[in-house]
Amino acid sequence: MVNVEAISLYGTPNIGVYIFANDRFALIPYDAPEKLDRKIAENLSVDAFRVSVAGTRLVGIFLAGNNNGLVVPRVILDSELEHLKSLLDVNIVVLEDVRETGIGNLVLANDNGCVASQILPKSAVDRIADALGVECIQMSIGDVPFVGSLSVATNRGVALPPLATEEEIKSVEEALKVKANVLTVNRGKMFLRTGLVANSKGALVGEDTTGHEMMQLQRIFFQ
């Protein structure tokens, strides 16, 4: 039985802003409530590690990756980077030459492929592909460049917002080599990553998510 649970964090349903997760671990804010560790263990079946990025809680916005690697922004502090390296046995690449810092908003990846924002320079996309061990394409979704904040991918499926065109859905499926379908969370919100944290084992979703949205989420990732 796959677990999917609706929660809030810091009084908001926008839980994905604060959490990065894959099939091996989760990264959560340094001051997250202890019950979050338990929720992650119960639903995602991984251990949670407490970190900060640029001195903030915004782990989900700043980080992107898959089970092979992690991409971090130039604003990460040296001490934070060393902490990540001590915790994790994955490739970690810092995008020092990229002006944008919300890497989680710009990269959608699983272990089969990667979709990067057209905002990113080709040199950065090549470094991301190397770190994650996959091929990486660049595209927008519904003319919006923030492919990472609009979508959520695992090795079992991809959730895309309703503004994605049929052609874009097909392109994402070909890049990530899993089925994609449309979803909203938190009562119709289309920036899926802000309200959804998923891996191949389960998911956490914002507490405003409706029963219908939960059922669609189950269909996309766990059927």
UniProtKB/Swiss-Prot annotation:
Gene3D superfamilies: L-arginine/glycine Amidinotransferase, Chain A. InterPro entries: eIF6. Keywords: Initiation factor, Protein biosynthesis. One of its GO terms (molecular function) is translation initiation factor activity. Transmembrane segments: none annotated. It comes from the Archaea. One of its GO terms (biological process) is cytosolic ribosome assembly. HAMAP family: eIF_6. This is Translation initiation factor 6. The keyword Protein biosynthesis applies. SMART domains: eIF6. Binds to the 50S ribosomal subunit and prevents its association with the 30S ribosomal subunit to form the 70S initiation complex. Belongs to the eIF-6 family.
